[in-house]
């Protein structure tokens, strides 16, 4: 994935003593200089799949950013598509998949090591000699948007946060009659919202719980026609954020963003860089 303007490295990062790992493509500006470049961590959307079209956001590195686009399951993105499909069928089952794995105990929930891994990724990025020593941005959409906010809530080193229609937000809202909860919509899965331990875990790992801790300037976007991550759940996050914040609401959008919106996010980060 190297070009005449950027360099790319595939990184496998061990995130804990248990052996959990995350893979990611690390993009550098060509001839990156020591102490000169802001870093951007980009977590993935939901699912068990490869890292989608790594060069689609090459303009970050072309504009001077070091960008680390990750997956969260410890699966080499070079594996064949068929392998990812088989793994997904085997482990991402019809009762919530990995997002329901271990919900009965918040200390054993699958997303625990994922959330911790975000901090480990920031450890890695801030250890790079080319990092400018000041700017750590997080950026993502859907599950990636959720993880961007979680990272900003967990780690005070984050200086800019950008999230599209964050998933994992207001997940237990379905417990109250007439309310819509966030992705992955646990009302569809047998018994989860009738289990008090599961509800406690959902509240603990909910993006809203981390949004209250975010200090970095935050740019949040969502669409009114999104049935995957309903706009009410993005409002729950927005209303909880107490940091400097800016929003982009797109009434026509479903669960997608335009290339213009994606590019504007990078421009927003540039505008908010610490000089």
Protein language model features and the residues they cover:
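Short beta-strand/loop motif that positions the catalytic acidic residue
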Residues: 214, 220-222
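Short beta-strand element of the alpha/beta-hydrolase
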Residues: 23-24, 28, 35-46, 67
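Gly/Ser-rich "nucleophile elbow"/oxyanion-hole loop immediately N-terminal to the catalytic nucleophile
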Residues: 97-142
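Acidic catalytic loop of the alpha/beta-hydrolase fold
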Residues: 224-229, 255-256
């Amino acid at each position: 994935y190297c070009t005449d303007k950027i360099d790319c490295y595939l990184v496998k990062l061990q995130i804990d003593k248990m052996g959990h790992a995350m893979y990611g493509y690390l993009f550098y500006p060509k001839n990156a200089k020591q102490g000169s470049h802001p870093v951007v961590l980009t977590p993935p959307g939901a699912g068990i799949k490869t890292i989608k079209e790594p060069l689609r956001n090459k303009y970050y590195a072309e504009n001077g950013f070091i960008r680390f686009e990750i997956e969260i399951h410890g699966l080499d993105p070079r594996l064949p598509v068929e392998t990812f499909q088989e793994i997904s069928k085997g482990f991402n089952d019809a009762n919530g998949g990995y997002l329901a794995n271990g919900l009965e105990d918040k200390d054993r929930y699958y997303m625990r090591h994922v959330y911790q891994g975000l901090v480990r990724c920031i450890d890695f990025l801030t250890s790079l000699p080319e990092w400018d020593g000041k700017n750590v941005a997080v950026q993502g959409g859907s599950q990636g948007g959720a993880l961007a906010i979680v990272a900003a809530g967990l780690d005070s080193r984050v200086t800019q946060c950008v999230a599209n229609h964050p998933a994992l937000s207001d997940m237990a809202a379905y417990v109250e009659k007439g309310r819509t909860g966030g992705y992955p919509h646990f009302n569809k899965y047998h018994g989860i919202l009738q289990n008090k331990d599961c509800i406690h875990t959902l509240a603990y790992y909910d993006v809203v719980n981390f949004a209250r801790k975010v200090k970095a300037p935050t740019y949040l976007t969502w669409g009114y026609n999104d049935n995957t991550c309903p706009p009410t759940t993005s409002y729950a996050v927005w209303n909880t954020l107490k940091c400097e914040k800016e929003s982009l609401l797109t009434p026509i959008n479903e669960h997608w963003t335009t290339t213009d919106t994606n590019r504007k996010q990078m421009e927003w980060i540039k505008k908010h860089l610490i000089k």
